[in-house]
Amino acid sequence: MMICLVFLCVLTLARGEIYPPICPAPGVGNDEAVRAGELLLEISAYRNQRSGRVELWGSAAVNNQVFYGGMENSQIDYDFGKFLVFRCFQVFNNVHKLLFNTVSSATMHLARKRVQKCGHGKMTFISIQVQCSVNKKSIRLSRMSEASLKKQVLRVAFFLDRNNNSWIADKNFQGEDRTMLRLWNELSTYQQYLISSCNNDVKILSELYGEFRQIALPYDEKLNLNFMPVIRSSSERLFRADDLKCSFSRWLGAEGEFAVCEYSGWGVSRLGKIEIFAEKPLTFDMAWKTVKMRSSGAYTSLFRDDVTWGLIPLDKWVGDKYFCMCTNKESGDNVIVTLPEKNVEKSIQIYDEGSAMLSFAEMTSIILNLMFMGAVAVSVGILGISCFVGLKEIIYFIFVSVDYMWPFCDTLLTTAVNCFFKGRTFLRRELKI
C-alpha cells in the first residue's frame, strides 16, 4: 500500500509541483495518537540542511509504545520500530530514486528552487501516513505551511467507512490546494486496493514480528511488545534555555518495576544522547557505572517532537540510586536528572576509565594506611610483651626466628648484632656470631 502511495506521488510530481509554495513550519505534528492495536507507518520528504539534498524520513509505531524514526541509511537495532522502518526503507530507497529521476527537467528545476528557498533547518515538505486497526483505517497526506506568520498544517485524510467499504474525504486546510486535490483524486481510484492492503497489514505485521523476534531474542531474552505500564512518579528538567526536556520516570509493569529516561525536543533524535547510571559497590567504595539499556529515538507524529529514550529494569540492579544524563552531542552541554524517590549526592562520580584510575589510587592509599597501622600495632604489641618477659628474650626470639627462616640473612644479622649489641655476649653466643 505504501508503495502505491509513493508511486502516486511520482505521477503527481511528473504532472505538476508537489512542494508547497512557501517554507514549511518545523515541529508541527498531527493531533491524533495511535491507540493500542494500531499500526502507523509514515514516510516524509524533507531537505537536509547540511547536504542540501532532499531525503526521506520514515517512522513506525505500534501500540503507542514501540516506535522509531530514521533516515534512509538507518541501521537495524533490536527495537521493533527500528526494524519496521528498516524494512520500509529497503523499498522506499528505490522508490525515492525513481521519484526524483523520472520527472521532467522543468519540474525538477522548480522542485530544487523550492528546496533552496527553505534553508532554515530540517523541514517536512510532504508526509504520507497509513494507519490500520480493527476499528479504524485511514490514510493521511500532510503538508507543512506558514501563512500570516502563523504555523499551520494543511491536511487531508480519507477514512474508511466500514458500512460500505468506501472512503470518506476529510479536508482540513484553508483555501484550495490543487496539488493536494489532484493527488487525492488519484488515490480515490485505488480504493479497493487500499482497503485490501490495509486489511492485510495486520498479517504482514505478524510475519515481520515473528522474523524480528528471531533476530532480537539473542539480545533481549524477554521481549515484551504489548506491555501497558502505569507511571508511578517522574522528575524532569529543562535543558538550558532551549525547549528541550530531560525526564526520568519510574514505571510499574506486569513484570516488575522499570525506569524510563526520555530526552525530547526538536533535533534530539539526531543530536541527543542519553546515558543511565546506577550506583554500584566496588571493593572499598561506591561508584557510578553505566547501565545497559534498551533505547530508541524518533521524530513521529505520536509525540509531535523528537524523542530519544532508554529503558532499564530496576529489579536487576542492587543499587538504590540512579540518574540519567542527557547530552547535546553538538554543543557538549548536559543535564542530570535523578530518579524520583531516590536522593543522589551533589557530587556524582561516574565510573569510567578515569574514575577507575582514581579508584586504584584510593585503594593503594588505603592499603598503605593499613600497612602503617599494622606496623604500629606490632610495635605496641612488642613493647607490651616486653613488660612481662623482658626485652632481651623478645629480641633474641626475633633474631633466632629470622636466622632460622632465612639463612641467607647471616651476614645482615652479624652486622646488626655487631653494631647494636657489641656488649651482649648472650646474643652473640646464641647466634654463633
Curated annotation (Swiss-Prot):
CC annotations in GO: host cell endoplasmic reticulum membrane; host cell lysosomal membrane; membrane
Family per similarity comment: Belongs to the herpesviruses U21 family.
Domain of life from the UniProt record: Viruses
Gene it is expressed from: U21
Domain notes: The ER-lumenal domain associates with class I MHC molecules and is responsible for lysosomal sorting.
Compartments where found: Host endoplasmic reticulum membrane; Host lysosome membrane
Membrane topology: Single-pass membrane protein; Single-pass type I membrane protein
Membrane spanning stretches: 365-385
Topological region Cytoplasmic: 386-433
Coiled-coil residue windows: none
Lumenal side stretches: 1-364
GO annotation terms (biological process): symbiont-mediated suppression of host innate immune response
Descriptive protein name: Glycoprotein U21
Keyword Transmembrane helix (UniProt): yes
Function description: Plays a role in escape from immune detection by associating with and diverting properly folded class I MHC molecules to an endolysosomal compartment, effectively removing them from the cell surface. In consequence, surface class I molecules are down-regulated and infected cells are masked for immune recognition by cytotoxic T lymphocytes. Also plays a role in the down-regulation of the host stress-induced NKG2D ligand UBPL3, which enables immune cells expressing the NKG2D receptor to recognize and annihilate infected cells prior to viral spread.
Alphabetic keyword roster: Glycoprotein, Host endoplasmic reticulum, Host lysosome, Host membrane, Host-virus interaction, Inhibition of host innate immune response by virus, Membrane, Transmembrane, Transmembrane helix, Viral immunoevasion
Residues carrying sugar: N164
